[in-house]
Amino acid sequence: MIESSIFQRMTDYASLNRDDVTLDVGAGLGFLTRFLAEMCRGVLAVEADDRLVEVLREQLWDLPKVEVIEGNVLKIQIPVFNKVVSIPPYQVSSRLLLWLFNKSFNSVVLILQKEFANRLTAPVGSENYGWLTVLTYYHAECEHFEDVPKSFFYPQPDVDSIIVRLEPKKPAPFTVSNRMLFTKFVQNIFTERNRKVRNAIRPFLRNVLMRTAEEAEKTARTLPFRDERVRHLAPEDFGALLNALSS
């Protein structure tokens, strides 16, 4: 990112203040990190590339508010933070969101690939509607803000980008019997998004819940929404399905 004017807008969307500890994932050369350090109490600058980590430490040595952390954010222990303002590598976007959905935070502001961001709020039944849509709906309020011009990046990407904000839903919009199992269930059943529920759910019953083929067949015939196609179910319907399996 070579256009620093976008940093102010990102921090505005995050309502960043002097009490915040902010996570910057994929801190790179530290341009955004330095800007964040002027706005909040502390910044956790996480970078997986050891060469960039050395650059970060050289560039940010004069900022005691910044803690440079080397490693994959998905695999290492991270100190407590309450906000995220970041331009993460696009290839980790879905895994990063799943990781964040299991953390406590007040606000997350990210620059994401626009095509990916559209999946977060896709209408039920649409081409972009999928497991990520359902999990985002369950965990967070998601808002799309402004497009980010390709000229703001160096090198310029081939894809369009957009600023997105996520804020946790409290309480959750519906109840599920097991949050971790819900994630696995939705990911699993959407591999058969065009099939009817009674057929799409059988691999989950056999391979995850360890039901016999006979038990899976019997369960599939009695489930709610069994004759609906997976892609036509609303997020709440997936919660009802899992709860029915757990009852």
Please report, for each region that a protein language model flagged, where it lies by residue.
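An accessory alpha-helical subdomain
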Residues: 162, 166-242
